[in-house]
Amino acid sequence: MSTSLTTCEWKKVFYEKMEVAKPADSWELIIDPTLKPNELGPGWKQYLEQHASGRFHCSWCWHTWQSANVVILFHMHLDRAQRVGSVRMRVFKQLCYQCGTSRLDESSMLEENIEGLVDNLITSLREQCYDEDGGQYRIHVASRPDSGLHRSEFCEACQEGIVHWKPSEKLLEEDAAYTDASKKKGQAGFISSFFSFRWCLFWGTLCLVIVYLQFFRGRSGFL
């Protein structure tokens, strides 16, 4: 069975970020389409992402649609003694509401979306497997255009009993404030660098003018 591009991208991003987050431990990411919510073995932890943004493509009628309600289930386990961890992952599918086929279709995601989702996964992993403060989660539903209301009858996750939550206004405001603060910080850094460059350019030009005047003054005295 061929491996989809999205699956390869998930593994690539996960391994790169885990190498930075926990370089002393060895982690693996396994795609498991049979994963069930809340069915955990001893020592396993769960993280559920309910509002990922993805695009679906019907393999029967070629209809495409965008959804901001893609559900992704993660089960995580860390063997502290062996320093080996495992993440099992399932991306829930959706049915095409255009042609009504019973064939479930997989979603595709942009790399930037996958990176944000992996950041959330690592945040949960730090909290549940390492007892650390993982940091702030990113809320992907904010500013994600959707193709319409979520239709639970076409959603695999809804059919298996996963109830979608909606982030509160407070969480959305915090997420927007976090994004604005990051942008302002970047702009401030750019402005600071710009003025530092202009200041150095000014002093460099002034030094050249002084050297130039001294040189010609010396030549005038010699003549």
UniProtKB/Swiss-Prot annotation:
GO terms for molecular function: olfactory receptor binding; zinc ion binding. It is found in: Cell membrane. GO terms for cellular component: cell surface; endoplasmic reticulum membrane; plasma membrane. The chain crosses the membrane at residues 194-216. A zinc finger (3CxxC-type) spans 52-161. It is a single-pass type III membrane protein. Predominantly expressed in olfactory and vomeronasal organs, in mature olfactory sensory neurons. It holds the Pfam family Zn_ribbon_3CxxC. Its main location: membrane. InterPro entries: R-trans_p (IPR026096), ZAR1/RTP1-5-like_Znf-3CxxC (IPR027377). Keywords: Cell membrane, Membrane, Metal-binding, Transmembrane, Transmembrane helix, Zinc, Zinc-finger. Residues 1-193 are cytoplasmic. One of its GO terms (biological process) is protein insertion into membrane. SMART domains: zf-3CxxC. Residues 217-223 are extracellular. Interacts with olfactory receptors. Specifically promotes functional cell surface expression of olfactory receptors, but not of other GPCRs. Belongs to the TMEM7 family. This is Receptor-transporting protein 2. It comes from Mus musculus. The gene is Rtp2.
